[in-house]
Curated annotation (Swiss-Prot):
Keyword check for Lyase: no
Propiece span(s): 20-36
Disulfide bridge partners, by residue number: C39-C53, C46-C58, C52-C63, C57-C70
Cellular-component GO terms for this entry: extracellular region
PROSITE patterns: I_CONOTOXIN
Residue ranges crossing the lipid bilayer per the database entry: none
GO molecular function annotation: ion channel regulator activity; toxin activity
Protein name: Conotoxin ar11a
Chief place where the protein resides: secreted
Keywords, alphabetical: Disulfide bond, Ion channel impairing toxin, Neurotoxin, Secreted, Signal, Toxin
Tissue: Expressed by the venom duct.
Length: 75
């Protein structure tokens, strides 16, 4: 138990000693600010593939289930 407490203490104080500033873009910071990154489901609006949930592609501004890897025709 003492080893665990010591380890946590070192992790907390290490950035203070090295002079690092904590990032506001950390996951815990996002949770505290209420920022959530969610994915769009099938049929929902999207702009790019990364906005759709896993295994889906963005085509025609809507997410759809992809049988194969996402591809886009050059228009």
């Amino acid at each position: 138990m003492k080893l665990c407490a010591t380890f946590l203490l070192v992790l907390v104080t290490l950035p203070l000693v090295t002079g690092e500033k904590s990032s506001e873009r950390s996951l815990s910071g996002a949770i505290l600010r209420g920022v959530r990154r969610t994915c769009s489901r099938r049929g929902h609006r999207c702009i790019r593939d990364s906005q759709c949930c896993g295994g889906m592609c963005c085509q025609g501004n809507r997410c759809f289930v992809a049988i194969r890897r996402c591809f886009h025709l050059p228009f």
